[in-house]
UniProtKB/Swiss-Prot annotation:
Name of the protein in question: Adenylate kinase 1, chloroplastic
Main subcellular localisation: plastid
Catalytic reaction annotation: AMP + ATP = 2 ADP
Quaternary structure annotation from Swiss-Prot or TrEMBL: Monomer.
Family the UniProt entry places it in: Belongs to the adenylate kinase family.
One cellular-component annotation, GO: cytoplasm
Gene that produces this protein: ADK
GO molecular-function terms, A-Z: adenylate kinase activity; ATP binding
Tree of life domain: Eukaryota
Span list, region NMP: 81-110
Lineage: Eukaryota, Viridiplantae, Streptophyta, Embryophyta, Tracheophyta
Enzyme class: transferase
Length: 284
């Protein structure tokens, strides 16, 4: 099986799938809180020297993939999105394809068994390519998954991205993909006014170039009914998961203040990475 490698130690994923199918997963060992969770006095570290092992949580459409992908590029670690793994399996016409299609189109969560199997295969492939560290996006989604993950490796930090539900619905309904190049875009223009002490949120659409305009397609599961069902299911399952990581001192909750131009610099600051990006830009 694949191994999740960290500096000065490694955590074997041997038996990762078998652990899941056992009646229960052993409780993971409590780890020291990530230095990124401390206040302004937190020491800055060189993330590339740490082979970071991070998890991104958040409702569907919040932008986990966008920010996890950017951090992946900045830190030089793989971004592993379980949603992408599911879509790749759907497109493969493999044995799980039809079953997954029914689950996704109904807005249901894919079972733990399937997700663990797909993730195990991805980690094995990554190890073969010499990858170390990771940023997980979309896993874990359940307490069972979190316990399994905690049993085989130490997570440094869990970033929980947040947006108001009405913004999430609009973002999901605005998602588009170019059927030719495969790039993702968003046609939603969001301008939520602030009220009751809550700041307003403005997000410009992420429009495609001219050559992609006529080739845009919508995901089958991005209908209002399905999106709201997914949000409801996520909210029901996320609270125990958030509390699990909160008690371990690993949860960082981050309210997105707007689109990428507003949110990215503030996220880097919260992660103590703002000066790191500047150094990377100078070195480039």
């Amino acid at each position: 099986m694949a191994r999740l490698v960290r500096v000065a130690r490694s955590s074997s994923l041997f038996g990762f799938g078998n652990r899941f199918y056992s009646t229960s997963a052993e409780a993971s060992h409590a780890s020291s809180p990530s230095p990124f969770l401390h206040g302004g006095g937190a020491s800055r570290v060189a993330p590339k020297d740490r082979n970071v092992q991070w998890v991104f949580l958040g409702c569907p459409g919040v932008g986990k993939g966008t920010y996890a992908s950017r951090l992946s590029t900045l830190l030089g670690v793989p971004h592993i999105a379980t949603g992408d793994l599911v879509r790749e399996e759907l497109a493969s016409s493999g044995p799980l394809s039809q079953k997954l299609s029914e689950i996704v189109n109904q807005g249901k969560l894919v079972s733990d068994e399937i997700i663990v199997d797909l993730l195990s295969k991805r980690l094995e492939a990554g190890e073969a390519r010499g990858e170390s560290g990771f940023i997980l996006d979309g896993f874990p989604r359940t307490m069972r998954q979190a316990e399994i993950l905690g049993d085989v490796t130490d997570i440094d930090l869990v970033v929980n991205l947040k947006l108001p539900e009405e913004v999430l619905v609009d973002k999901c309904l605005g998602r588009r993909t170019c059927s030719q190049c495969g790039k993702g875009f968003n046609v939603a223009h969001i301008n939520l006014k602030g009220e009751n002490g809550r700041p307003g949120i403005s997000m410009d659409p992420l429009l495609p170039p001219h050559q992609c305009m006529s080739k845009l397609v919508t995901r089958a599961d991005d209908t209002e009914e399905v999106v709201k069902a997914r949000l409801r299911i996520y909210n029901e399952t996320s609270q125990p998961l958030e509390e699990y990581y909160r008690t371990k001192g690993k949860l960082m909750e981050f309210d997105l203040p707007g689109g990428i131009p507003e949110s990215w610099p503030r996220l880097l600051e919260a992660l103590r990475l703002d000066d790191y990006e500047e150094k990377q830009s100078v070195a480039a």
